[in-house]
Amino acid sequence: MAVYTHIEDDELATLLARYDIGELLSFAGIAEGVENSNYLVRTTTAHYILTLYEKRVDEADLPFFIGLMEHLSAKGLQCPVPIQDKTGAILQTCAGRTAAMVSFLDGTSHRFPNREKCAAVGSALAQFHLKSDDFTIMRHNALGPESWAPLLASITGDIPDLPQDIRQNAASQLTDILATWPHALPRGFIHADLFPNNALFVKDKLTGIIDFYFGCHDILAYDLAVLLNSWCFDADSSFNVTKSSTILSAYQEQRLLSDAEKQALPLLCRGAAMRFFLTRLYDWINTPADAVVKPLNPMEYYAKLRFHDTAPGPEAYGLWS
């Protein structure tokens, strides 16, 4: 979450008048995140999150994102609930942006989660996959494997503060990944961005999954690979197989992985690391120096990519047949 677009008091008052959610007590921008502008809105009835969708979000995708949250919350998954105004509408206009109000979830995120939190998120991801099985709105993964080569080709010019051969090395890795990508694995709706900052906890209890704005229809086990990449490397950059085995065990208590999914896990982890390396590398070069949100260092995911490249098999993640 972040703030790019600022809201004037009168604009917020006009927006809130459309809802039956009580009187405004306070509102404040939320600094974390990279995609949209987010505000915490506190009224006499409850707390809410107001999201203003920025230019990187395709408005044609908003019915998918809103619909997926509605569908999953109705199925009992802990996630934000979109709030309807007095006419039943969810999408609004505020400060020149399309906007939506969703319920506020208690809890905080943890950059380096413990084992208990890993178990909770592994179980929740499986529930996400199962509960979304009958969702009917489709969305292609705009950052799926077919986008990686064009994205790398678009990264031109000098790469400040990074090894100069990094582009060539990434191209070699990418060629290998794409040549063997497991397209035939089971597919469904995935979160695609379930980093630790998108899971909220009170102590070790998961209180909600947030930020559905990369959600799409793709390989289910790829979603697990994104999770392993973002949850299982410790502060010293070492891979924590205890965390990964905990996530995988908790996931499989809800949804068993097929043998093909298990065998493909190292490749899927390589692909997930490549996806985040490339998007971070692009932002590293193309983000203006005075940008509100600073780009994340792509070398974190390049190091993860190299780890997965040496993984002998699914057992490297604590997964045995």
Task: Spell out what each predicted region is.
Residues 1-86, 203-205, 319-321:
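Conserved NTP-binding catalytic cores of kinases and kinase-like/nucleotidyltransferase enzymes
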Residues 7-18, 136-137, 150-192, 202, ...:
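An alpha-helical support segment within catalytic cores of ATP-dependent transferases
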Residues 31-44, 49-50, 82, 175-222:
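Active-site acidic catalytic loop and adjacent metal/ATP-binding pocket
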Residues 43-137:
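ATP-binding pocket architecture of kinase catalytic cores
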Residues 99-112, 153-157, 276-291:
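A glycine-centered beta->alpha junction motif in the catalytic cores
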Residues 111-165, 185-187, 292-295:
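A cross-family kinase active-site recognition segment
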Residues 142, 276-321:
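ATP/Mg2+ or Mg2+-diphosphate-binding catalytic cores
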Residues 221-256, 271-288:
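Active-site activation/catalytic loop segments of kinase-like enzymes and analogous catalytic loops
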